[in-house]
Amino acid sequence: MMSKVCTIAWVHGTVQGVGFRYSTQREALQLGLTGYARNLDDGSVEVVACGEADNIEQLIAWLKAGGPRSARVEKVFTEPHQPDREYDKFSIRY
């Protein structure tokens, strides 16, 4: 059994209004991750991903590579995250 970890990421650039959260959700679900993606007031998207470390790294690499074609990612900040609860799915928050 591999250990489950969580990472929080903030994605900056042209990432709102371009289907970014939906694409991130689809990508995360394919990787078996839980967590959420939500738009922040500063125009960035916050992503919390929990699951196998390797799969989280794949999601972060996908985010850094630019995510969906319609988006333009300028920078991605990540740090380890200790959520206050367990996520049972990967959801889109509003």
UniProtKB/Swiss-Prot annotation:
Limits of the Acylphosphatase-like domain: 6-94
Protein name per the record: Acylphosphatase
PANTHER family reported in the protein's UniProt record: ACYLPHOSPHATASE
Gene3D superfamilies in UniProt: 3.30.70.100
Reaction equation(s) it catalyzes: an acyl phosphate + H2O = a carboxylate + phosphate + H(+)
Keyword Lyase attached: no
A Pfam family that the UniProt record links to this protein: Acylphosphatase
